[in-house]
């Protein structure tokens, strides 16, 4: 037989799960244990003491002969006579009188013991009558027959419920126990419950929860008591805060919403280092991540809720079933029973009267069991009422939001909501503390504290570098926010914030008086009102790199003193048909607009800044730019770059830009430039860059663009240079590198103002002597050609500072290179063996640049 502890273990759950057991579940668990005890007690009693005792019902005599009076002399007859009489009675006599014997043991013994001996003297008949004969009735059954009939009548005469009540009660109780805790055992729900309880316990014990709640208490108290200074209020609200000499807590803090009197700054900045150490901070940040993932995992289903409802319905149905059939058997349990086993051929009797010694005990236990199951059932009905009375698949933290400063705690749904409702039945404080870890404001505060603890002023100083413009630059990458110490770097010129989604710029940025350039790379920074006012007046250059237009902060379009704006991101996806630059008209001082995207047309909104825009750059990343009409309105643009726009011809809209000075059409598909004659109307055009295209020839009409000073045709398919190019007397820079040019015309000598000539990567084999008449040349790149000799007249280029000859077919260098006094070894790009062919004095002259810095430094 099993013990009570072994069966009761079915009702056991992990101690940590008790927070998910409301009072009715606990009460039903105890009732189940009581029912289990009743069932086991009844079963034990039945196995050890359950007996049925039966006696035959003897027939009554029908006449006086059939019955011998107790004092009759026939009673004293010998045993054989009595046996014969007994046999005679068994064969044919019937009677209506029923008598019960006093013994169920062997009938021979009482017969010999109860009848008087026949050798007594009978002198006095009266004395004999005073000594009564035994009144019991003889059955003449032996012991085995009684055992047999007791067993037969136990199974035939007793109601089945009297025999199986303990076992049925035990089975019903076990089913109820399993039903009560099935949601703790079923794998698909058990895993979620276990995870929830684990996270809930950690959130409850986390120091960050205590700190956050203390901050909330301080903030609420300060809002109600604005009359108290920080030195008086801080010891009252923050028992673990810093020393009494801390700054006043009533100092107003300016944020995005305006002025706010609170003890927030002392509570966050000073006590955070003592209340929340680095280890606790890391654990709290891990908890936020766990809560976020658990919410996403649990909120998408309601399996736990449905399973709890199903098991409650099963328990209720079980209660109704038990109550209905059990109540019918209460009256069926009785002490006396009549048994007709139909074994006359074995026993000689047809009817037996039986007694059940456990009847009264079983009846009382059954009534007790019914009473307990009724209480159990009423609790089940109450549970169903609770389940369907309120929407348990929705949980609102409205009360927590009202009591705390975390107004962003979201409402939850489905299984997450149901678990929180169950926890509320245990202790609502768990949900309140758990809600802190659902708040983004709380998480941001934690990140801010940890961030400021890690990124101190000294550490930020070590990360400052100087950029190409010799400005102090700080680059912060993938942080949880912007450390407060950044805004103490008052001499910083450039600030780069990359991949910081929660970046906030406080009013302290007004201390950075040297800050003029800001980079926001995938960083939709939020600014406070005071910070915005400072940026609006002082910021000159802004770089914004984004994936979606929504990442461009709205305040960017309101920086009235901004001079340069760089926008890099996708502006032509399915969600971004038009660039969101509606507010560019507020950028009254914008001079340079750089857009690197994938536009199909020039946004019309750019015309809002047309009156003062001087430079427009569009890098289109290979997307074909189809509509360029908006360019016609940009009359003041001096520099225009349309790179990688898949243009096949020079856009006609460009010819309307009368103030255009520099045009860059790099990396397009331009094959012909017959429209170049129209550039003669652009009187100020001095630089034309048509490099990295597919241009085959330069039309002679280029001679009409007389003001050109720089001409770039590198990386095209040119095979020759037209004479018209050399009629551009103002030309200072000519770049025809990486083409198929095989000859340099002798007319090149006409370019008396030429300073930079690039012919690298062509097929030139001979250098005309007229080339060296361009005595103003400073840069001459002739690498990767087929040149076999360098004319001695190269010595006429006295201003030459860079000469590239590498990759040719030269066998020596002329000694006249020594006459190029501005040329040094660092500016001479040539193979080492060719350099060694120079005379020693020439090599020494070229190497003087190595010693000059040392001489200057002494």
Swiss-Prot record:
SUPFAM superfamilies: L domain-like. Residues 227-251 have a biased composition (Polar residues). It catalyses: chloride(in) = chloride(out); iodide(out) = iodide(in); taurine(out) = taurine(in). Residues 49-163, 329-360 are extracellular. Keywords: Cell membrane, Disulfide bond, Endoplasmic reticulum, Ion channel, Ion transport, Leucine-rich repeat, Membrane, Phosphoprotein, Repeat, Transmembrane, Transmembrane helix, Transport. It comes from the Eukaryota. It is a multi-pass membrane protein. It holds the Pfam family LRR_8. One of its GO terms (molecular function) is volume-sensitive anion channel activity. The volume-regulated anion channel (VRAC) channel forms a trimer of dimers, with symmetry mismatch between the pore-forming domain and the cytosolic LRR repeats, a topology similar to gap junction proteins. This is Volume-regulated anion channel subunit LRRC8D. It comes from Homo sapiens (Human). The gene is LRRC8D.
């Amino acid at each position: 037989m099993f013990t009570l502890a072994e069966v009761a273990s079915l009702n056991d759950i992990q101690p940590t799960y008790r927070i998910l057991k409301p009072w009715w579940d606990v009460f039903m668990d105890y009732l189940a244990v009581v029912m289990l005890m009743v069932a086991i007690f009844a079963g034990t009693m039945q196995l050890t003491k359950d007996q049925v005792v039966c006696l035959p019902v003897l027939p009554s005599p029908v006449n006086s002969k059939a019955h011998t009076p107790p004092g009759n002399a026939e009673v004293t007859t010998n045993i054989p006579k009595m046996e014969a009489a007994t046999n005679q009675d068994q064969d044919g006599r019937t009677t209506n009188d029923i008598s019960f014997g006093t013994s169920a043991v062997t009938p021979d013994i009482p017969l010999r013991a109860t009848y008087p001996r026949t050798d007594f003297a009978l002198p006095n008949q009266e004395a004999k009558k005073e000594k009564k004969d035994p009144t019991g009735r003889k059955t003449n059954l032996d012991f085995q027959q009684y055992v047999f009939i007791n067993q037969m009548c136990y199974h035939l005469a007793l109601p089945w419920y009297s025999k199986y009540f303990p076992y049925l009660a035990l089975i019903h109780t076990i089913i109820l126990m399993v039903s009560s805790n099935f949601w703790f055992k079923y794998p698909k729900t058990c895993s979620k419950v276990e995870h929830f309880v684990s996270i809930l316990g950690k959130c409850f014990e986390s120091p960050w929860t205590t700190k956050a709640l203390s901050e909330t208490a301080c903030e609420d108290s300060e809002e109600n008591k604005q009359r108290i200074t920080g030195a008086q209020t801080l010891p009252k609200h923050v028992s673990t805060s810093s020393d009494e000499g801390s700054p006043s807590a009533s100092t107003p803090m300016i944020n995005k919403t305006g002025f706010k009197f609170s003890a927030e700054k002392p509570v966050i900045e000073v006590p955070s280092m003592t209340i929340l150490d680095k280890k606790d901070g890391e654990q709290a940040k891990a908890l936020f991540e766990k809560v976020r993932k658990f919410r996403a995992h649990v909120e998408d289903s309601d399996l736990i809720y449905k399973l709890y409802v199903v098991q409650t319905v099963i328990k209720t149905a079980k209660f109704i079933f038990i109550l209905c059939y059990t109540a019918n058997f209460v009256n069926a349990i009785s002490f006396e029973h009549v048994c007709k086993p139909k074994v006359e051929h074995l026993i000689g009797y047809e009817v037996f009267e039986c007694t059940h010694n456990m009847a009264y005990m079983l009846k009382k236990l059954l009534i007790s069991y019914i009473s307990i199951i009724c209480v159990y059932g009423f609790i089940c009905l109450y549970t169903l009422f609770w389940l369907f009375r309120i929407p348990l698949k929705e949980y609102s933290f409205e009360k927590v939001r009202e009591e705390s400063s975390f107004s962003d705690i979201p409402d939850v749904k489905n299984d997450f909501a149901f678990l929180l409702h169950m926890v509320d039945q245990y202790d609502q404080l768990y949900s309140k503390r758990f809600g802190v870890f659902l708040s983004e404001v709380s998480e941001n505060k934690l990140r801010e504290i940890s961030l400021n603890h890690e990124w101190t002023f000294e550490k930020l100083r070590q990360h400052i570098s100087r950029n190409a413009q010799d400005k102090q630059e700080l680059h912060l990458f993938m942080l949880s926010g912007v450390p407060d110490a950044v805004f103490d770097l008052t001499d910083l010129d450039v600030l780069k914030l990359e991949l910081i989604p929660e970046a906030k710029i406080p009013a302290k940025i007004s201390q950075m008086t040297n800050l003029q350039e800001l980079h926001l790379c995938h960083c939709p920074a939020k600014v406070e009102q005071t910070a915005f006012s400072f940026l609006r007046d002082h910021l000159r250059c802004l770089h914004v790199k984004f994936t979606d237009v929504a990442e461009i902060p709205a305040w960017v379009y309101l920086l009235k003193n901004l001079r340069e704006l760089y926008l890099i991101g996708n502006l032509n996806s399915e969600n971004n048909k038009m660039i969101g630059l509606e507010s560019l008209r507020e950028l009254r001082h914008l001079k340079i607009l750089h857009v690197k995207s994938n536009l199909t047309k020039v946004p019309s909104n750019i015309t809002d800044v047309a009156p003062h825009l001087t430079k427009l750059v569009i890098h289109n990343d290979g997307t074909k730019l189809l509509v360029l009409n908006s360019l016609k309105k940009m009359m003041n643009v001096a520099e225009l770059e349309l790179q990688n726009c898949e243009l096949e011809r020079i856009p006609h809209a460009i010819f309307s830009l009368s103030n255009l000075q520099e045009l860059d059409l790099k990396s397009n598909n331009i094959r012909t430039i017959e429209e170049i004659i129209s550039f003669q109307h652009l009187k100020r055009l001095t630089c034309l860059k048509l490099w990295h295209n597919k241009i085959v020839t330069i039309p002679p009409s280029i001679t009409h663009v007389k003001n050109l000073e720089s001409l770039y045709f590198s990386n095209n398919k040119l095979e020759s240079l037209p004479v018209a190019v050399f009629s551009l007397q103002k030309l200072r820079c000519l770049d025809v590198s990486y083409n198929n040019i095989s000859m340099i015309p002798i007319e090149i000598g006409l370019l008396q103002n030429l300073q930079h000539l690039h012919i690298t990567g062509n097929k030139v084999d001979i250098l005309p002597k007229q080339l060296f008449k361009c005595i103003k040349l400073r840069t001459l790149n002739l690498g990767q050609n087929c040149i076999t000799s360098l004319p001695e007249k190269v010595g006429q280029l006295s201003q030459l500072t860079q000469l590239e000859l590498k990759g040719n077919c030269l066998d020596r260098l002329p000694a006249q290179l020594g006459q190029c006094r501005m040329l040094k070894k660092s500016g001479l790009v040539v193979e080492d063996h060719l350099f060694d062919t120079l005379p020693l004095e020439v090599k020494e002259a070229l190497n003087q640049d190595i010693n000059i810095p040392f001489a200057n430094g002494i």
